[in-house]
Amino acid sequence: CLFGLIEPGDEVVAIEPTYDCYLPILRRAGAIPKLVRVAPPDWKLPLDELAAAFSHKTKLIMINSPMNPASKVFHEEELAFIAGLLEKYDAYAICDEVYEHMVYDGRRHIPLMTLPGMAERCLRIGSAGKTFSMTGWKVGYTTGPAALIGAAAKAHQFLTFTTPPN
């Protein structure tokens, strides 16, 4: 998804700790990572730091919820704050939700794309392998608006041998 949506020099906000391949992919694509860290014991999103990470150069934010490796699940107030920043800066979100069905302790997964105005700004990543506890499958998918899916598919078709062009 990233190679289809960002250009060298674009800023991308990433929330740490993050999945280990995100930062190398961002750097390979020429993006400038803007990192915001959540920390134990409460894993609370520092909203002031998040707001400071956004600028007119921000192209997108990468959200991993439920978060790997921290298992943080973003709550509705945090997602609403992120949505406001996306609208303010005309930015997008790549939402890694591969662990969406692995939420415990009374917490609830809320996809960012379900918030008002976010369906056109979000690409959502899912995983059949994670959903069906077959992690070796490595079968993933994206959902989102046609414009974002099209851009991601054009880049992705040259990275694998099994992806149709459209």
What are these regions (language model features)?
Residues E16, L35-P40:
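Short beta->alpha connector loops at strand-helix junctions that form conserved
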Residues V38-D105:
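Active-site phosphate-binding strand-loop segment of PLP-dependent enzymes
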Residues C1-E11:
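Phosphate-binding glycine-rich loop
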Residues D10, A31, L86-Y92, M118-E120:
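A short helix->loop->beta-strand "cap" motif at the edges of active sites that frequently abuts
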Residues L115, A119-N166:
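Conserved core segment of the aminotransferase class I/II
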Residues T18-Y22:
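Conserved coil-to-alpha-helix start sites within the AMP-binding
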Residues R28-K34:
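A short helix-loop-beta submotif of the ANL/AMP-binding
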